[in-house]
């Protein structure tokens, strides 16, 4: 049996990568998958602190900074109760990808790879790169990757002096919002 995909005006044989994507997308709530044999030690401590600070900025009344890491991570859904296994708390796949160490992520998802290339001015060569397994970016998980790449993208935005129709200086903030949303997606 073969799998086909509709592209423009015809049906074409799907590549192995496309089939893999179909299977991934067909899984219900894969991010909430509870992982066996993973603990808080599989998460990057620096990322946990960054995450606590970010959440605390949004919701300062909840005293997240006062919570111990495990209590905080349970409250955020990074660890959830496995109701089929004596109600033990287990790490979610999303929690691993978002806050995990590279070693722990790779042990569960061996093909997981984050990569950002800045090819400004030359499409054949990159001038800046953020990539998994790069010693310049230890324990690169989704949270660290997002923060590093966001800052690098924002640094590339030219901000010339320009006035709008009301003689008010235009800001790069709108472009930053659009770029941030694109990166998140």
Which ranges hold each PLM region?
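Active-site helix-to-loop segments that bind/position phosphate- or nucleotide-bearing substrates
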Residues: 3-184
């Amino acid at each position: 049996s073969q799998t086909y995909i509709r592209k423009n005006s015809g049906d074409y044989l799907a590549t192995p990568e496309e089939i893999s994507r179909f299977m991934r997308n067909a899984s219900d709530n894969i991010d909430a998958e509870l992982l066996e044999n993973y603990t808080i030690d599989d998460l990057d401590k620096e990322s946990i602190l960054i995450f606590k600070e970010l959440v605390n900025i949004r919701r300062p009344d909840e005293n997240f900074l006062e919570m111990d890491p495990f209590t905080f991570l349970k409250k955020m859904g990074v660890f959830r109760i496995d109701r089929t296994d004596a109600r033990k708390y287990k790490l979610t796949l999303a929690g691993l990808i978002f806050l995990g160490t590279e070693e722990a992520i790779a042990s569960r998802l061996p093909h997981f790879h984050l990569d950002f290339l800045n090819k400004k001015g030359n499409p054949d060569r990159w001038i800046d790169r953020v990539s998994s397994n790069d010693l310049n970016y230890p324990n690169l998980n989704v949270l660290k990757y997002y923060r590093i790449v966001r800052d690098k993208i924002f640094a590339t935005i030219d901000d010339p002096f320009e006035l709008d129709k009301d003689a008010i200086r235009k800001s790069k903030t709108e472009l930053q919002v659009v770029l941030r949303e694109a990166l998140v997606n």
